[in-house]
């Protein structure tokens, strides 16, 4: 598991790091520690090749969380922004209403919805990890469906194999605030594809 941190140090300046964990509990502990220090914590949506973890353990600290090192995925994830100037919904209720409309109009299962502090992340959790090629195909097709249905999503997030997203139970410290990252709706559970 890869945990990514982003510490805001001033106007448009930040320090980023990545941490590798061998278990969910170890990853959670890293995230809790970062959050207690008012540092934004994210998790990588991909599982990475074994060699990546071995390099990290040997002290290689360069950015190993890159798309070419990603191999398996357990979620299809999408980002809906709120309150930004463009490609965004004005308010959270409007974003959630539009998401519900698109899901219902297309007979999709309701996704897990996470309030990120500045929008929502939606996740279709998979019952078992899938390989990158299958993930890219599924994520891309669902992205096209969302866009064609009029849902305003960040088009890059959904097929970015090196993407990191905020961790539920931590906080969004962007812009000097402390907004909880929380589950808004649990959705219809995990899915098989």
Predicted regions and their residues:
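Residue-level "edge-of-site" marker
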Residues: 2-4, 116, 159
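Helical (often loop-to-helix) elements that flank the catalytic cores of nucleotide-handling enzymes
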Residues: 86-105, 126-153, 173-193
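Catalytic micro-motifs at enzyme active sites that drive phosphoryl/nucleotidyl and oxygen chemistry
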Residues: 60-68, 99-115, 152-157
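Conserved short beta-strand edge segments in small beta-sheet-based binding/regulatory domains
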Residues: 42-47, 147-159
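Histidine-centered divalent-metal-coordination microenvironment in nucleic-acid enzymes
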Residues: 75-78, 103, 109-137, 162-172
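Residue microenvironments linked to proteolytic maturation
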Residues: 154, 158, 164, 174
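DNA replication initiation on ssDNA origins
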Residues: 1-75, 80-89, 163, 169-178, ...
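Alpha-helical context
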Residues: 54-58, 122, 143
């Amino acid at each position: 598991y890869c945990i990514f941190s982003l510490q805001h140090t001033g106007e448009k300046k930040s320090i980023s790091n990545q941490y590798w964990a061998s278990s969910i509990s170890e990853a959670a502990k890293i995230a809790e520690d970062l959050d207690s220090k008012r540092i934004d914590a994210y998790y990588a949506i991909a599982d990475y090749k074994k060699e990546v973890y071995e390099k990290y353990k040997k002290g290689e600290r360069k950015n190993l969380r890159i798309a070419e090192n990603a191999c398996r995925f357990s979620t299809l994830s999408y980002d809906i922004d709120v309150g930004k100037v463009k490609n965004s919904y004005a308010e959270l209720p409007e974003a959630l209403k539009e998401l519900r409309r698109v899901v219902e109009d297309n007979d999709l299962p309701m996704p897990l919805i996470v309030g990120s502090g500045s929008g929502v992340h939606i996740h279709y959790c998979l019952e078992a990890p899938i390989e990158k090629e299958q993930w890219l195909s599924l994520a891309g097709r669902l992205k096209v469906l969302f866009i064609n249905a009029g849902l305003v999503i960040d088009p890059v997030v959904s097929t970015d194999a090196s993407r990191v997203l905020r961790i539920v139970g931590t906080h969004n410290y962007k812009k000097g605030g402390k907004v909880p990252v929380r589950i808004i709706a649990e959705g219809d559970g995990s899915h098989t594809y």
